[in-house]
Structure formats: structure tokens, C-alpha cells
Swiss-Prot record:
Keywords: Chaperone, Disulfide bond, Endoplasmic reticulum, Phosphoprotein, Repeat, Repressor, Signal, Stress response, TPR repeat, Translation regulation, Unfolded protein response. This is DnaJ homolog subfamily C member 3. Residues 375-393 are annotated as: Flexible linker. Residues 451-481 are annotated as: Disordered. The gene is DNAJC3.
Length: 504
């Protein structure tokens, strides 16, 4: 269904045309209109006035079928086509009107308008000149003269645009073409010429816009679809590239360049889709391998290299391989300093490496470009908590393990340190006190890091054994006394209070 506002707008644009229809309401007799045709014409006119374009069109189709030599039927059908934005369909009807009634200046004037919009300047000028020679009304004469002046200006601008293009002055050519296309809005060739200028000037997205318009204005425009596909490909948009090259092959399945390009895009698209599926499954090493294949498949297109590295950076970060993640993310950020995805992934890698200042800096930079991203906000808050925590007691440092250490590594480190710092090993009173404090920290670290829930709290910047951290202040940092840890074996897999442990 056509929107009422759209209908009003389109009818308004052909309003002078509709006035002519009113003048024609009594001319049916001149054409020898039979009763059925007259009925279709009158009903169609009422429906058109009411904005019911599809229904009006059906009536005028019936009128044309009933009397193929009735110029009024063709004229009114052309009016509906124009109101529906179907100028291509209107043009043959207007031509038929002129064939049937050569002195019908309104139809010739309207055809001149359409030809001018299509950029067919010589044909448009011919219509306007014939209008002036056919005893036009005062308004028709003024309109024809005005359009002749406009057409002459378009001829001059077109010549200047072509000269500028031939001289490789693409900026000047674009300026001239901009002015022409304000009038000759349906000129496919000029849009394609401007697209070439945009490509030369490094503005591929503007070129795509013109080429898309051209693909609709010109039938079977395989060349436009091919160029759109290659431009999307060079921009790194493999999905849209694949979609556009398929449109080319729908028009001509034997198109050599489109078919060759289709095979290349399809291969790349399959690799990327496979890699993304592996990422969803958490198979990061396999995904990295796929993206490395993407870079080998299309080394000549920079966009695929940088996008592949961006995803490899993400995989390393998620796979908790911080050194590799930082290296690859940094390569991306050297080229694209504001790449939010790479900033987030590198920040996560910095957290694993306990480089909190660097993580905070990356999160803050990312937030400048995407302030509403919840992941960035939460990451920044976590990094700030961990920085503050690192200035207090750090259980990972106490045991000498990395933040991504497995439970087995934590238990192994704990046992080694517990044996080393057990107070029973020290006879000197001062050394014993120092060992007691050290042993308490070691045991606390083991308790927190071997318990998944407590470890998660600590990883989020909260010390589960610190009253101040737990309650937001108001208490002293929690340290268990040596007495509370006695009877606790570093080799026990259960809780801390099994039996007294002695070294002999």
C-alpha cells in the first residue's frame, strides 16, 4: 500500500499535469470513445484524484486495452505512472500520445521534462522547441523557454565535466557533475562517471552510492554490480561484496569477471564464517589458524589483514595468552589507534599481565569513542579496583603465580612456599615472627585462590579476606593469627584445620 504522504508528494510534483487532465474531461468524444472506455477513464480519474494510484492504473490499463488509439487513456496512464515514481513506464505512454495527437503540447512538454532528467539533452531540447512552435499557452511557452535555458546550461556543464575528467582533474569533474545531476537525476552514465571520479579521489562509499543508482536506472547493468562488489570487497565487507556479485550473475551467469570474483569472495567468506563459528565455540587456536588463512588468501587487500589481526588479537585475549594478545593488538592499534575492539582486548590482556595502568589507559581511550559500552565501563572499574588492590595484598604475587594460573599450579606453588616458610623451620625469634606472617599470607593466598567463588571476587578487585574491602571501609585489614593456622597441612586437599604439621 502506498503511504498517503508519499502519494500527496508525488501528485504535487505532477500537479500541472493533473490540471491538463481536468481540461481533457470533455475531449473523449473527439476520440470516438465507447461507453466502456469512457467509464474506465472517468472512474480512473476519480481514483487518481483520491490518491488510489494502483486502482486508477487498473482502470487506465482497461481503457487502453479497450481503445488502443485513445490518446487520453495513454496520457492519464502516464500521469499515474509519474505519480507512482515510474518515469520509465510513463515515457512510452507520452510518446504514444504524441504519435496519436502531435499538437498535444502538454504531453510533449512533459516528455521533455523526463528526457531532461534522463540526461537526453538533445531529445529534450527538440521537444521544447516543438512546443514553442505549436501555438502553446502562455504558461507552456514560459515553461518551454525556461527548460531550454536549463538544458543549454547542462550541455555546457557536461562538456566541462568531460574535459576535467580527461585532464584527471577529478575534483573539478565532481563539482560539475554535482550540478548536472541536480537536474539530470536519472542519467546513469553521468552517475557512473562521477563514481569513477570518487574512486580516483579515494571515496569508494560515495562511488558505491552512484553505482547503485545506476544499476537501477539502466537495465541489465552487470558492470555496475561488478564494480559495487569489488569496491565492497576492497572495503573489507565480504558479505555485501558476495551479495552484489550474485546480482551480476543473476543477469549474466557467464559473466567472466563476475564469476571469477564470485569464487574469490565465496572462498574468503567461507573462511571468515568458519573462523567466527570457531570463536563462538571457544576454539580460539583453530580460529586463529583460519584468520591466518584469510590473510594468505587476500594479502593484497589491507582491510582483510587488519580485520584478521583484530580477530586474532581477540582470540589470544580470550584464550588467556596475554603476551601474544598484546603483540597483535598493538599491531592493529598502530594502524587504527581508535579501534575500540583492539583496545578492549589489549586491556584484558594487560590485566592478566598485571599491567593495570596500561589497562586503565586502554579502557579510557576506548570509552572516549564508545562511552555507552557496558563492557568498557565494567572493565575500567575492574582495572581500577585491581590497581588499588595491587597496592595492598596480592595473593597471586604471594604465591608467585600468574593471574591465569590453574588450580594445580596454585596448589604446587603453595606447598613449596609453605614448606619453605613454615615457622617450625626457624629458631630465631625475629625470624620466626617474620615466617609466621609470611606463612599466614601464603595460607590465605591458597585459601582464596583455590576456591572458585573467592578467587572470582579477588579477580574482580575485592579481597574476600579483607574486612575493609568487604564492607567498603570502617574495619582493619583481616589477618589471621598464627595460632588459627596451626594444625594445618600444606599437603591436605581439604580445609585448613586438619592436623598439626611438624618438620623433624
Amino acid at each position: 500500500m502506498v503511504a498517503p504522504g508519499s502519494v500527496t508528494s508525488r501528485l504535487g510534483s505532477v500537479f500541472p499535469f493533473l490540471l491538463v487532465l481536468v481540461d481533457l474531461q470533455y475531449e473523449g468524444a473527439e476520440c470516438g470513445v465507447n461507453a466502456d472506455v469512457e467509464k474506465h477513464l472517468e472512474l480512473g480519474k476519480k481514483l487518481l484524484a483520491a490518491g488510489q494510484l494502483a486502482d486508477a492504473l487498473s482502470q487506465f490499463h482497461a481503457a487502453v486495452d479497450g481503445d488502443p488509439d485513445n490518446y487520453i487513456a495513454y496520457y492519464r496512464r502516464a500521469t499515474v505512472f509519474l505519480a507512482m515514481g515510474k518515469s520509465k513506464a510513463a515515457l512510452p505512454d507520452l510518446t504514444k500520445v504524441i504519435e496519436l495527437k502531435m499538437d498535444f503540447t502538454a504531453a510533449r512538454l512533459q516528455r521533455g521534462h523526463l528526457l531532461l532528467k534522463q540526461g537526453k539533452l538533445d531529445e529534450a531540447e527538440d521537444d521544447f522547441k516543438k512546443v514553442l512552435k505549436s501555438n502553446p499557452s502562455e504558461n507552456e511557452e514560459k515553461e518551454a523557454q525556461s527548460q531550454l535555458v536549463k538544458s543549454d546550461e547542462m550541455q555546457r556543464l557536461r562538456s566541462q565535466a568531460l574535459d576535467a575528467f580527461e585532464s584527471s582533474d577529478f575534483t573539478a569533474a565532481i563539482t560539475f557533475l554535482d550540478k548536472i545531476l541536480e537536474v539530470c537525476v536519472w542519467d546513469a552514465e553521468l552517475r557512473e562517471l562521477r563514481a569513477e571520479c570518487f574512486i580516483k579521489e579515494g571515496e569508494p562509499r560515495k562511488a558505491i552510492s552512484d553505482l547503485k543508482a545506476s544499476s537501477k536506472l539502466k537495465n541489465d547493468n552487470t558492470e555496475a554490480f561488478y564494480k559495487i562488489s569489488t569496491l565492497y570487497y576492497e572495503l573489507g565487507d565480504h558479505e555485501l561484496s558476495l551479495s552484489e556479485v550474485r546480482e551480476c550473475l543473476k543477469l549474466d551467469q557467464d559473466h567472466k569477471r563476475c564469476f571469477a570474483h564470485y569464487k574469490q569472495v565465496k572462498k574468503l567468506n567461507k573462511l571468515i564464517e568458519s573462523a567466527e563459528e570457531l570463536i563462538k565455540e571457544g576454539r580460539y587456536t583453530d580460529a586463529i589458524s583460519k584468520y591466518e588463512s584469510v590473510m594468505k588468501t587476500e594479502p593484497g587487500v589491507h582491510e582483510y589483514t587488519i580485520r584478521s589481526k583484530e580477530r586474532i588479537c581477540h582470540c589470544f585475549s580470550k584464550d588467556e595468552k596475554p603476551v601474544e594478545a598484546i603483540r597483535v593488538c598493538s599491531e592493529v592499534l598502530q594502524v587504527e589507534p581508535d579501534n575500540v575492539n583492539a583496545l578492549k582486548d589489549r586491556a584484558e590482556a594487560y590485566l592478566i599481565e598485571e599491567m593495570y595502568d596500561e589497562a586503565i589507559q586502554d579502557y579510557e581511550t576506548a570509552q572516549e569513542h564508545n562511552e555507552n559500552d557496558q563492557q568498557i565501563r565494567e572493565g575500567l572499574e575492574k582495572a581500577q579496583r585491581l590497581l588499588k588492590q595491587s597496592q595492598r595484598r596480592d595473593y597471586y604475587k604471594i604465591l608467585g603465580v600468574k593471574r591465569n594460573a590453574k588450580k594445580q599450579e596454585i596448589i604446587k606453588a603453595y606447598r613449596k612456599l609453605a614448606l619453605q616458610w613454615h615457622p617450625d623451620n626457624f629458631q630465631n625469634e625475629e625470624e620466626k615472627k617474620k615466617a609466621e606472617k609470611k606463612f599466614i599470607d601464603i595460607a590465605a593466598a591458597k585459601e582464596v585462590l583455590s576456591d572458585p567463588e573467592m578467587r572470582k571476587k579477588f579477580d574482580d578487585g575485592e579481597d574476600p579476606l579483607d574486612a575493609e574491602s568487604q564492607q567498603g571501609g570502617g574495619g582493619n585489614p583481616f589477618h589471621r593469627s598464627w595460632n588459627s593456622w596451626q594444625g594445618f597441612s600444606p599437603f591436605s586437599s581439604g580445609g585448613p584445620f586438619r592436623f598439626k604439621f611438624h618438620f623433624n
